[in-house]
């Protein structure tokens, strides 16, 4: 084994010289230089500096403006709540531990940090799945006369929290466990060992199938069908410029949504799966740290993709920030009018942009 396994930790370095110490008790500067921990802390501070205001603003603006309190926006708000979970449950903890160079908060802190970070990520992931299904049902109309109501939105919210907890809670209850990973100043699921009594293998397989592969398949299916529906509507109205514009708008949104999903999850999932299937192989502390912390940037681009590209929300946000006035009102108004025209045109072909 090219690492050192101890009680509730795994350090990716062989302890041939006796230098390896518990990541709960000693600085891990033998893994990487103190400067690397400082850079990690600075990166997390940047995510908090940007992620907290934009997600808090999303919640505040929606509460402030009644016209934004639509069933679909309930799911979008759930994304903001998930991102705030990551900010408070994971990012603040990592800043503190990276300042010390090890997981100074002990096993209880590791369990809490791992749980809240996993919960926030999973709520966000399953919120995207609910959004994809909603778009498919409303736009492609596999169920005739379906209307996404407040009850559907509430069921979607409950579903995301149930699924998120079905992934984040088991390691607290003995099915797998949370341990420090990478540079040993943040915690995640134990992909690294087959520790007796924790059944890590079965949990990791369950997590990858139910909490990665299935969501990925659902998102691709729903947005693939959405793209086909928009193209069919545009083909039926070859001379309609507004329909073509609507097709481009929906296509752009779909592409950005799928790319955001893949960019966030595939690097982390790929590295985690590699470590799980190659336990005992040699890898450095940065091998898991880089994709794990890159995935945390979802707290920034989630609201940008799913909310800030919404013209109505953008108008309300500017109005809130500018004390009730929108200095770009004429431009925003023209843009909103064009958007309504496009939506109306495409709606006649049973398609509506996001």
Curated annotation (Swiss-Prot):
The chain crosses the membrane at residues 37-61, 74-96, 111-133, 153-173, 203-224, 253-274, 287-308. A motif ('Ionic lock' involved in activated form stabilization) lies at residues 134-136. One of its GO terms (cellular component) is photoreceptor disc membrane. Signal peptide: none annotated. The record marks 113 as: Plays an important role in the conformation switch to the active conformation. It is found in: Membrane; Cell projection, Cilium, Photoreceptor outer segment. The modification N6-(retinylidene)lysine is found at residue 296. One of its GO terms (molecular function) is 11-cis retinal binding. InterPro entries: GPCR_opsins, GPCR_Rhodpsn, GPCR_Rhodpsn_7TM, Opsin, Retinal_BS, Rhodopsin, Rhodopsin_N. Glycans are attached at residues 2, 15. This is Rhodopsin. It comes from Poecilia reticulata. The lineage of its organism: Eukaryota, Metazoa, Chordata, Craniata, Vertebrata.
């Amino acid at each position: 084994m090219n690492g050192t396994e101890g009680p509730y930790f795994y350090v990716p370095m062989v302890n041939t010289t006796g230098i390896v110490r518990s990541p709960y008790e000693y600085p891990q500067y033998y893994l990487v230089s103190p400067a690397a921990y400082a850079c990690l802390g600075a990166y997390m501070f940047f995510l908090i500096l940007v992620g907290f205001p934009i997600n808090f603003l999303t919640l505040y603006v929606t509460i402030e403006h009644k016209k934004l309190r639509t069933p679909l926006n309930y799911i979008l708000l759930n994304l903001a709540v998930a991102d705030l979970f990551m900010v408070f449950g994971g990012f603040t903890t990592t800043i503190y531990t990276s300042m010390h160079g090890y997981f100074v908060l002990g096993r209880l802190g590791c369990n809490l940090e791992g749980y809240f970070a996993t919960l926030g990520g999973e709520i966000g992931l399953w919120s995207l799945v609910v959004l994809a299904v909603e778009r498919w049902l409303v736009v492609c109309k596999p169920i005739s006369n379906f209307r996404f109501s407040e009850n559907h939105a509430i069921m979607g919210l409950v579903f995301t929290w149930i699924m998120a907890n079905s992934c984040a809670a088991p390691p607290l209850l003995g099915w797998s466990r949370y341990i420090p990973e990478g540079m040993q100043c943040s915690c995640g699921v134990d992909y690294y060992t087959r520790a007796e009594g924790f059944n890590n293998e079965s949990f990791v397989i369950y997590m990858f199938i139910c909490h990665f592969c299935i969501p990925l398949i659902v998102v691709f299916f729903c947005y693939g069908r959405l793209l086909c529906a928009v193209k069919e509507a545009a083909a039926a109205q070859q001379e309609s410029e507004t329909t073509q514009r609507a097709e481009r708008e929906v296509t752009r949104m779909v592409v950005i949504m799928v790319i955001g999903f893949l960019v966030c999850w595939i690097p982390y999932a790929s590295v985690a799966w590699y470590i799980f299937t190659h336990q005992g192989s040699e890898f450095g502390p940065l091998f898991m740290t880089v994709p794990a912390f890159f995935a945390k940037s979802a707290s920034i681009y989630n609201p940008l993709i799913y909310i800030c590209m919404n013209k109505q929300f953008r108008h309300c946000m500017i109005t809130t920030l500018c004390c009730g006035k929108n200095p770009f009102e004429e431009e925003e108004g023209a843009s909103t009018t064009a958007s309504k025209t496009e939506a109306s045109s495409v709606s006649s072909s049973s398609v509506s942009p996001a």
